[in-house]
């Protein structure tokens, strides 16, 4: 492994992808372009928000002392890909093989799992919504986040309420594969570095999402590190924009933008720590303007798929119905 400076990341840990065509802009909190990009639902890295400065001391030792005795969701995988799946849907789908295992453990048990990973090829990823089970010091740190700035952004762009703050602690090399969320996201980096690849919503047909009723709803079926072009030919036309975020950076990930997040190799301990600020989207306007935006088109497609599944009483029959409707009528 290459030698690299403390607090930096190993450039050799960056995978090369042919689909990357541009860099996400990095802007100051004082730059008017920052807010124009957010207004236009375009990604931007904001370098000086001080959004989570009070959490800069959140290393593993501090968190172990102060997170409390609550339980945390920790995922384990034999490879480095942590593809999201809906646990309730997975239980109902007998043929579905979960891409990772979910555990409900204390933070001390998570640290023990981290130590075990040093001796095995297993990877672990803690993904837990911050709640009232945390200790008082964490609460104090949380209250000192730059809420004034995010609240002003929420009001300025007409977003809905804050739905959750997700704490993410991952090993170097961990990947959250390509997916999109139905919420606005300020992704705040606390420790370590992450590489973020984003694809715009108008590339929906290039990224082959699972059906809405599938346990991996909103996830792409394409492994962009090793794409199967025979199965997913339109992925050749996909193009991503990327950024590497470090401590103090905040990446705005607009709703319905596809993204893949990769934890880069860094100094010991080899973990990255991040917090999501997820906000519900802007309510639908009273008057719909045409043409629809790419985000609105994705929303329409999701709703149509859901309604058809409900009407048919079987989500498995949706594809057959759509093919019957379209083939020979709209494919000539």
Which positions does each model-derived feature cover?
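N-terminal accessory scaffold of Fe(II)-dependent oxygenases
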Residues: 1-250, 258-332
């Amino acid at each position: 492994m290459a030698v690299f400076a403390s607090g930096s990341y190993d450039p050799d840990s960056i995978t090369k992808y042919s689909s990357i065509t541009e860099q996400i802009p990095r802007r100051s909190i004082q730059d008017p372009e920052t807010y124009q990009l957010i207004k236009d639902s375009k990604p931007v890295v904001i370098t000086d928000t001080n959004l989570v400065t009070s959490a800069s001391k959140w290393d593993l030792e501090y968190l172990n002392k102060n997170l409390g005795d609550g339980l945390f969701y920790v995922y384990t995988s034999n490879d480095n890909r942590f593809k999201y799946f809906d646990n309730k849907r997975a239980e109902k789908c007998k043929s579905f093989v979960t891409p990772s295992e979910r555990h409900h453990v204390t933070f001390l048990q998570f640290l023990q799992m981290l130590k075990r990973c040093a001796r095995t090829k297993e990877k672990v990823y803690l993904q837990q919504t911050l709640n009232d089970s945390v200790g008082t010091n964490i609460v104090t740190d949380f209250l000192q986040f730059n809420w004034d700035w995010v609240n002003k952004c929420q009001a300025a762009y007409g977003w809905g309420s804050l739905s959750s703050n997700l704490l993410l602690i991952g090993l170097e090399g961990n990947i959250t594969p390509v997916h999109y969320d139905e919420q606005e996201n300020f992704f705040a980096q606390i420790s370590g570095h992450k590489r973020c690849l984003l694809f715009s919503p108008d590339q929906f047909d290039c990224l082959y999402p699972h059906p809405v009723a599938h346990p991996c709803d909103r996830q792409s079926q394409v492994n962009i590190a090793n794409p199967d072009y025979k199965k997913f030919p339109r992925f050749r036309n996909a193009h991503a924009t990327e950024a590497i975020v470090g401590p103090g950076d905040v990446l705005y990930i607009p709703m319905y933008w596809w993204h893949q997040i990769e934890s880069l190799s860094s100094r010991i301990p080899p973990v990255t720590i991040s917090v999501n600020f997820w906000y519900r989207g802007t309510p639908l306007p009273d008057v719909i303007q045409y043409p629809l935006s790419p985000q609105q088109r994705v929303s329409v497609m999701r709703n149509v798929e859901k309604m058809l599944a409900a009407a048919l009483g079987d989500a498995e029959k949706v594809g057959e119905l759509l093919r019957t409707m379209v083939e020979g009528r709209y494919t000539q």
